[in-house]
Swiss-Prot record:
Species lineage: Bacteria, Bacillati, Cyanobacteriota, Cyanophyceae, Synechococcales
Keywords tagged on the record: Methylation, Ribonucleoprotein, Ribosomal protein, RNA-binding, rRNA-binding
UniProt feature coiled coil, ranges: none
UniProt-recorded name of the protein: Large ribosomal subunit protein uL11
Keyword Ribosomal protein among UniProt keywords: yes
């Protein structure tokens, strides 16, 4: 018989840098999960993506064991990295802070495709383009 899931925890952590300090410790500790085991496994699975924020979905079972699924980094993080900016514009309609090419847009959309509710790359590109526009990043052809 399958183990019963007692909690589903969603966190966004820097790749390769999870530690027992907040937010990881309190989120996992209240469900009785071995925090260091999670941190070591998360850091090992994300060591090739250092510098990105990787969302993770942790399933905690009734025997206090856990499994986790790594998601793709947020589109805003990928756009900021491609545009070479630290953060988006505070006023995106007036102040443009960066520029990305259509090729970079397609690459980001293909990276995010598994997490989107579409299987069409063009639709994913439109979703990412909207995020870029809201960050004050323009799309160059």
């Amino acid at each position: 018989m399958a183990k019963k899931v007692v909690a589903l925890i969603k966190l966004a952590l820097p790749a390769g840098k999870a530690n027992p300090a907040p937010p990881v410790g309190p989120a996992l500790g209240q469900h009785g999960v071995n925090i260091m085991a999670f941190c070591k496994e998360y850091n090992a699975r994300t060591q090739d993506k250092v510098g990105l924020v990787i969302p993770v979905e942790i399933s905690v079972f009734e025997d206090r064991s856990f499994t986790f699924i790594l998601k793709t980094p947020p589109a805003s993080v990928l756009i900021a990295k491609a545009a070479g900016i630290e953060r988006g514009s505070g006023n995106p309609n007036k102040t443009k802070v960066g520029k990305i090419t259509t090729a970079q847009l397609r690459e980001i959309a293909e990276t995010k495709l598994p997490d989107f509710n579409t299987k069409n790359v063009e639709a994913a590109m439109r979703i990412v383009e909207g995020t870029a526009r809201n960050m004050g990043v323009t799309i160059a052809d």
